[in-house]
Amino acid sequence: MTIGIDKIGFATSPYVLRLEDLATARDTDPEKLSKGLLLKEQSVAPITEDIVTLAATAADDILTDEDKEAIDMVILATESGIDQSKAAAVFVHGLLDIQPFARSFEMKEACYAATAALDYAKLHVEKFPQSKVLVIASDIAKYGIGTPGEPTQGAGAVAMLISQNPRILSFNDDNVAQTRDVMDFWRPNYATTPFVNGIYSTQQYLDSLKTTWVEYQKRTGLALTDFAAVCFHLPYPKLALKGLKKILDKSVSEEKKDQLQYNFDQSILYSQRVGNIYTGSLFLGLLSLLENDPQLKAGDRIALFSYGSGAVSEIFSANLVPGFEQLLDHKRMEKLDQRTVLSVSDYERLFYEEVDLDPSGNQVFEPATHQTFALTEIKEHQRTYQKVEK
């Protein structure tokens, strides 16, 4: 039995900030962002957009009524949780009208959790071949106005439908994971933005990649030459580029290096315009590769490197399925062009906008333009979401 990704969808917020404008406002050389980070834009979420609305929008774009009847598990991976008790997946399950006899829960381990969700989904489908699992990585990355991490913010969700006989990618049984207890990035319950040790986190990312890659090669017998492309977790593309160079060795021909570099360049196109979406960043890179690389063909093996601060990393691979191109959206760049461009002052206003409840725990919200799902009300401290009528 083959198991893998049958469908994949993506959603981001309707607003975008150009990093050239941010650099000017922060009195920074724009090339520090465009060349130093390889970033161009970042999506900005209004108060009516959160991990639930992004997740529901990403999944709604790909699911049929038949899918909703077959799905018996909904996993939402995030580090932008909206509730310390109720899983965001439960809200999403309801908004999508998925059949009731399903498990719905949330997973957390920084940017890594969506990979763990895929592992769990695969095991579930192995046990129950007729079932389908909806895995969604949904996050809003916020570091703070004027902080070093401000240029690497973003918002978005990637939804993946996992099933037997998948039509996009089939997973291989070659996962290798590593855990190390480090404090490179963390956000305590009392903090609204994370604490980041940037240089240390970069070191941990690259060392986790190198050591996990060495172990992966040892266990599988595979080498870099066996892969058509490598996708990386993308907190910002320049770090992933350093990662690619880290695993290139003298045994790789110049022709192969050129191929891997070209495919890497296709994998970062969406992230350059959306920014960091934490749990979804790796899979946004995968989606960008699949939708923008005309050289890929059925049977090609793709390696994926997942990293979550704290830290857990994992390397695994998947093979492209014949006809995968038909399940993709090749007009995604045009959709990104349709976002509303914000001035820096408008971005700052949205950044600082917070829930302002009355004494009874109530507030009504007006959905932003072009939202598919929106937070419309908080009533007695209970969040209400609705599909927005077009």
Please give the residue ranges for each predicted region.
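Condensing-enzyme catalytic core mediating Claisen C-C bond formation in acyl metabolism
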Residues: 1-48, 147-203, 207, 316-390
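Conserved beta-ketoacyl condensing-enzyme motif
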Residues: 5, 51-112, 222-247
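Acidic, glycine-rich active-site loops and adjacent beta-strand->loop/helix elements
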Residues: 9-11, 77-82, 109-114, 137-142, ...
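Short, well-ordered amphipathic alpha-helical segments that serve as non-catalytic structural scaffolds
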Residues: 29, 51-66, 88, 204-220, ...
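Conserved catalytic cysteine-centered active-site region
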Residues: 32-36, 40-50, 80-132, 249-281
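Flexible, glycine-rich active-site loops centered on histidine and acidic residues
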Residues: 126-159
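A conserved active-site cap/scaffold subdomain adjacent to cofactor or substrate pockets
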Residues: 199-220, 224-248, 270-275
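Catalytic phosphate/nucleotide-handling subdomain of diverse soluble enzymes
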Residues: 287-337
